[in-house]
């Protein structure tokens, strides 16, 4: 593809390389380093004048450092006269801080949106935003892609009893997500209502729906410490489910997450590779990964060529 340059940040170079390979491109030359006072330095190693630039950087790992690196890369390309700069952020940072849910709470997702715009981003590509209203925090185009087509494909190919499954949301907020998947599989859905007093602490769960003698598939956009989904798995098994799977777009898996998954009765915990999972897979055999590089690559190709991206909302590109 002419007049396009693809750069990778430090957060997820494996995913960036997969995207580049699918597009038939070489990753652009960029050198990032830290000064002795921990300031981030970025040097773009090739001309971007008049080019359509895409920078892939996920909101994971050292999130604050990686966010700052992304902002500097965007700005460096912008002031080097690139025609357009698109930030490809598979897992959007600070997405859970999307509303003022208590006195004096910041809306940090809006702040991140402002920072990306001020840095010079012309367009954002992301996946399964924790709160879809974050798109409205921007005054530039935002394409929020969905892992759902890839999830449906994985279910059909890997769960032999998928016609006897029930799709379960671990909280009321995910009801729209699970009903969409259930409708497309032509199966039923259920949800778990949770009462939470503190972040990452689940106090009480109420199952709404009948899971008896069915394969239960928990679906959510992300899991952090995994307290919710592990409690949900116990709830589903006690309610008569024959097997329990969890499918998540963003597997953050911090703190006690891995030990909780190992102790829980999951057949598998399936995540996409919006966040690197290689190290976690070494400590947990239940984790399986869906590659979404083809979705990002096709979104980049369509954006560059001025084509519609909405096809990707319902199809997995080859």
UniProtKB/Swiss-Prot annotation:
The keyword Chaperone does not apply. Pfam families: Pribosyl_synth (PF14572), Pribosyltran_N (PF13793). Activated by magnesium and inorganic phosphate. Competitively or non-competitively inhibited by ADP, 2,3-bisphosphoglyceride or GDP. SUPFAM superfamilies: PRTase-like. The keyword ATP-binding applies. Residues 212-227 are annotated as: Binding of phosphoribosylpyrophosphate. GO terms for molecular function: ATP binding; kinase activity; magnesium ion binding; protein homodimerization activity; ribose phosphate diphosphokinase activity. ATP binds at residues 96-101, 130. It catalyses: D-ribose 5-phosphate + ATP = 5-phospho-alpha-D-ribose 1-diphosphate + AMP + H(+). Its EC number is 2.7.6.1. Mg(2+) binds at residues 128, 130, 139, 143. Its cofactor is Mg(2+). One of its GO terms (cellular component) is cytosol. PROSITE patterns: PRPP_SYNTHASE (PS00114). GO terms for biological process: 5-phosphoribose 1-diphosphate biosynthetic process; nucleotide biosynthetic process; pentose-phosphate shunt; ribonucleoside monophosphate biosynthetic process. Keywords: ATP-binding, Kinase, Magnesium, Metal-binding, Nucleotide biosynthesis, Nucleotide-binding, Transferase. Catalyzes the synthesis of phosphoribosylpyrophosphate (PRPP) that is essential for nucleotide synthesis. PANTHER family: RIBOSE-PHOSPHATE DIPHOSPHOKINASE FAMILY MEMBER (PTHR10210), RIBOSE-PHOSPHATE PYROPHOSPHOKINASE 2 (PTHR10210:SF32). HAMAP family: RibP_PPkinase_B. Homodimer. The active form is probably a hexamer composed of 3 homodimers. Belongs to the ribose-phosphate pyrophosphokinase family. This is Ribose-phosphate pyrophosphokinase 2. The gene is Prps2.
